[in-house]
UniProtKB/Swiss-Prot annotation:
Residues holding Ca(2+) 1: D99, N101, D103, E110
GO cellular component: cytoplasm; myosin II complex
Residues where N-acetylalanine is found: A2
Modified residues (N6,N6,N6-trimethyllysine): K96, K117
Subcellular location: Cytoplasm
Protein name: Calcium vector protein
Organism: Branchiostoma lanceolatum (Common lancelet)
Limits of the EF-hand domain: 12-47, 49-84, 86-121, 123-158
Length: 162
């Protein structure tokens, strides 16, 4: 499979890509390890071979780029190659990133990490608990893919209305 061609990202797409980057920027240094970036591409549903991923990474870094880390501009270059118009596909990719242990659901700890990383202000444990209860429609203590899709769609609709 050839690497997809880059396209211009819209403001919302850039914001979403940067939220994902921020999750992997563990030390808030505006960099993420290349090894994590490769994992991010895989978790986001990409089926590139190791060679294709390395070619994309090399292109994103540029000729004098850091071989161990990737910055936000490089990450946005990568995002422009895989971002899709299809909302459900986009939501599913985000779910896979947030489902850190890959068990098909987002548990409280994963949800707490997300909510405290992507929000403008970190949420308290009580606020995270309340948000989890709201998102966990069937009350089984985890957020599955349909619940996550509903949560994201509700959030997008609320943002459009405000």
């Amino acid at each position: 499979m050839a690497a997809p061609k880059a396209r211009a990202l819209g403001p919302e797409e850039k914001d979403e890509c940067m939220k994902i980057f921020d999750i992997f920027d563990r030390n808030a240094e505006n960099i993420a390890p290349v090894s994590d970036t490769m994992d991010m591409l895989t978790k986001l549903g990409q089926t590139y071979t190791k060679r294709e991923t390395e070619a994309i990474m090399k292109e994103a870094r540029g000729p004098k780029g850091d071989k161990k880390n990737i910055g936000p501009e490089e990450w946005l270059t990568l995002c422009s190659k895989w971002v899709r118009q299809d909302d459900e596909e986009e939501i599913l990719r985000a779910f896979k990133v947030f489902d850190a242990n890959g068990d098909g659901v987002i548990d409280f700890d994963e949800f707490k990490f997300i909510m405290q990383k992507v929000g403008e202000e970190p949420l308290t444990d009580a606020e995270v608990e309340e948000a989890m209860k709201e998102a966990d429609e069937d009350g089984n203590g985890v957020i599955d893919i349909p619940e996550f899709m509903d949560l994201i769609k509700k959030s997008k609709n609320a943002l459009k209305e405000s």
